[in-house]
Amino acid sequence: MADMIKVKLVRSFVGRPDKQRRICASLGLHKMNRVKELPDNAAIRGQINKVCHLVSVVD
């Protein structure tokens, strides 16, 4: 399971730019406090980095 990463939406994207909303949607995060398990690759890491103020990585 080392090549999977769990991401949780901890802040709302209401009032955020449309690009950040689309990034959250592409990560599968549509509601607050939901956790998604995603593959750990460079593309996903880059998306998480763009919205790092809205999400957290859960261990």
Swiss-Prot record:
InterPro entries: Ribo_uL30_ferredoxin-like_sf (IPR036919), Ribosomal_uL30_bac-type (IPR005996), Ribosomal_uL30_ferredoxin-like (IPR016082). It comes from the Bacteria. SUPFAM superfamilies: Ribosomal protein L30p/L7e. It holds the Pfam family Ribosomal_L30. One of its GO terms (biological process) is translation. One of its GO terms (molecular function) is structural constituent of ribosome. Transmembrane segments: none annotated. The keyword Glycoprotein does not apply. The keyword Magnesium does not apply. One of its GO terms (cellular component) is cytosolic large ribosomal subunit. Keywords: Ribonucleoprotein, Ribosomal protein. Belongs to the universal ribosomal protein uL30 family. Part of the 50S ribosomal subunit. This is Large ribosomal subunit protein uL30. The gene is rpmD.
